[in-house]
Amino acid sequence: MANSAQARKRARQSVKQRAHNASLRTAFRTAVKKVLKAVEAGDKAAAQAVYQESVKVIDRIADKGVFHKNKAARHKSRLSAKVKALA
């Protein structure tokens, strides 16, 4: 249990930030699933459009520090390869 006022405040902040980060991770997973679903459907135009949106989401989350930039790059690369394979 936090004893000082500073420690109590940091505990409150960490709870709030944890919830926010969880919502960002959920948005990330949803974006990736949308791309994979479009790829499985075989719709190249839709897959490219959804991929562009997912890249924005992934980059935004990496910029905020929720994920490491290398993790973001890895996911973008793998999604891009799947979209390009539809040709």
Swiss-Prot record:
Name the cystine pairs: none
Q: InterPro entries attached here?
A: Ribosomal_bS20, Ribosomal_bS20_sf
Extract the ranges annotated as region (Disordered): 1-22
Alphabetically, the GO molecular function entries are: small ribosomal subunit rRNA binding; structural constituent of ribosome
Q: Write out the biased-composition intervals (Basic residues).
A: 7-19
* GO biological process per UniProt: translation
The chain's coiled-coil residues are none
**Keyword tags:** Ribonucleoprotein, Ribosomal protein, RNA-binding, rRNA-binding
Gene Ontology cellular component annotations, sorted alphabetically: cytosol; small ribosomal subunit
The record's SUPFAM superfamilies line, in alphabetical order, gives: Ribosomal protein S20 (SSF46992)
Q: Does the keyword rRNA-binding apply?
A: yes
Tell me, in a sentence or two, what this protein's role is: Binds directly to 16S ribosomal RNA.
| HAMAP family documented for this protein | Ribosomal_bS20
Q: Which family does it belong to?
A: Belongs to the bacterial ribosomal protein bS20 family.
Name listed for the protein in its UniProt record: Small ribosomal subunit protein bS20
State the organism named in the record: Neisseria meningitidis serogroup B (strain ATCC BAA-335 / MC58)
Q: Which gene encodes it?
A: rpsT
